[in-house]
């Protein structure tokens, strides 16, 4: 079952998500491609793919990219990404046969899943000897501007952030090996409009009453009178499939 906060929040904000969310740094993608052996002839599942922020980078590895996304508005944009096979579906019921993919990636999405059910499904579609990678772009609050952006987000968000509770799913299930973490620096250049899109892309902002949402967007626009940079830590978690 897809979390209704994700459906409501992302369904109405798919365009803002595509414009406002950062991509992933080249060194992170290169490490991921090597770690997951993403080469021509292999198939990678990008699960909860959104608008294809990671999917389009996976295409560059030469691997076949199958992307699954439950939110229709996000999937419409995903379908425009060259080289990606976009499917409707959820992590808890992946529309693929058993042992049909060589790797699975999940970017900015696993925290929305029912973790144990999703891990069982991912284990089912992965071939033996393969691996799962989870990615998040975390706002780096050591940077003053990024901290100011985060303060506005925290003050206005309509529901609490879904934090590191996602890892409990790995503790409760025995489908994958202990998680390996690599962290990479990431930067995003924004102006007044794209920093507003960045805020609007948060599901907890998208569901606010209209006037509150407008006020939050005014506040972040004021942070970017000219082109500015938000800083992130891109976290890549990798776990191998157990037999």
Task: Give residue ranges: language-model regions.
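A short SAM/SAH-binding and catalytic strip from SAM-dependent methyltransferases
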Residues: 102-116
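Conserved catalytic/acceptor-binding region of the Class I
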Residues: 117-188
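Class I SAM-dependent methyltransferase SAM/SAH-binding core
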Residues: 43-45, 51-93
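A structural alpha-helix within SAM-dependent methyltransferase catalytic domains
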Residues: 33, 56-59, 119, 123
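A short acidic, Gly/Pro-enriched loop at the edge of an enzyme's catalytic core
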Residues: 92-103
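Nucleotide donor/acceptor-binding cores
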Residues: 41-42, 99
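Conserved Class I S-adenosyl-L-methionine
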Residues: 166-243
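Conserved class I S-adenosyl-L-methionine
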Residues: 1-40
């Amino acid at each position: 079952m897809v979390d209704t906060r994700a459906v409501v929040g992302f369904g109405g904000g798919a365009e803002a998500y595509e414009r406002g969310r950062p991509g992933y740094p080249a060194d992170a993608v290169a490490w991921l491609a090597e770690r997951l052996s993403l080469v021509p002839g292999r198939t990678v599942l990008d699960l909860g793919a959104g608008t294809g922020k990671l999917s389009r980078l996976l295409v560059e590895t030469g691997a076949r990219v199958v992307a699954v996304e439950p939110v229709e508005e996000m999937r419409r944009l995903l379908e425009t990404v060259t080289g990606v096979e976009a499917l409707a579906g959820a992590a808890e019921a992946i529309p693929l046969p058993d042992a049909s993919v060589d790797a699975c990636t999940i970017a900015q999405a696993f925290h929305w899943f029912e973790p144990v059910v999703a891990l069982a499904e991912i284990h089912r579609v992965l071939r033996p000897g393969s691996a799962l990678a989870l990615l998040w772009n975390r706002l780096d609050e050591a940077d003053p501007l990024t901290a100011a952006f985060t303060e506005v987000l925290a003050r206005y968000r309509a529901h609490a952030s879904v934090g590191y509770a996602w890892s409990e799913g790995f503790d409760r299930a025995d489908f994958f090996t202990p998680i390996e973490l690599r962290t990479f620096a990431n930067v995003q250049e924004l102006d007044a409009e794209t920093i507003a899109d960045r805020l609007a892309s948060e599901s907890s902002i998208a569901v606010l009453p209209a006037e509150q949402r407008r006020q939050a967007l005014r506040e972040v626009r004021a942070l970017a009178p000219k082109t500015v940079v938000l800083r992130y830590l891109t976290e890549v978690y990798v776990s191998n499939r157990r037999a």
